[in-house]
Amino acid sequence: MANSTLQVMDLTSLRAVLVDLRAQIIPSRFEKAQQPNQQSLQLGFRTLKGMAWLELSWQADAARLVQIPPPSRIGSGSTLAQQVQHGLRQLALVELEQRDFERVVLLHFAPRPGEPSVRTLVLELMGRHSNALLLDDQKRITAIARQVRQHQSRVRPLSSGDPYIPPPSLQSLPPSCEEPFAQWKRRLTLVPVDLGKALRDTYQGISPALTKQLISFPSRDEAPLPLSASTPVEEISDNQWLLLHGRWTQWLNHLRCGEFILHLDEAGGYRVWNDPADLTSNGESLSLRLGLYYRNHLNQRQLLKASLELQ
């Protein structure tokens, strides 16, 4: 498994994980927090079916929210783990909130289901700006994974005791099934750039992985489009635009309906929409299989690094 193939968790895969987790752990009772390394936090929840563990990571190239198998008990003594343990003690996880096309998840905690939230754990999946923060009932930061000082960001400094400031709003357009084909095409061809850049610059929620899926996804009805992310928009034929828009609409329908299935591909990446589910899942949930995907890739990366250091 090549370390270079690790796929970043994008908006689409985050939505898939949240759909899966809501069915499993909402509501559930918080029990345990531990920090196995400097870039992730593991949380244990008691459900009607037993314990479920989540991993929240703010690692720049592998920021993620996934389910994991029961982990080794390690890292409960870190400052962040102790702050989260104290802040969430005797509370229930009552909601997993994610707004629009933002890669920000709000885990809401209350004394019991049906009561107002009194603590919020925020996970921001934003590349090198990723972070995790615990907020009190006044939305003040009581614990933070990565302090952001004034000299690091004049726009959005983040420290314990500060009011929580959400990330700046996304500047591009939110994709919509209601947008007419002609307008969609016109926006993407307004500037003579490659297709990948046109999609990312014009619409929210677009990742390199999604771009590849939109243009090369195996379909039951059509051969894969002979396009790449580097294809100039002015060289795309009318028929290709129609096929691409069909894929675009399929993707948006999956987001709207919350229908996702996980397929791991031979190149080391994965997809969560518009493809048959793997037959090798052994009944494991989508969020758990993604947790294993990231664990395996990151373990492989560590082994490769260690072997190179020994040479």
Model-derived features: positions:
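Extended, highly charged segments
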Residues: 1-311
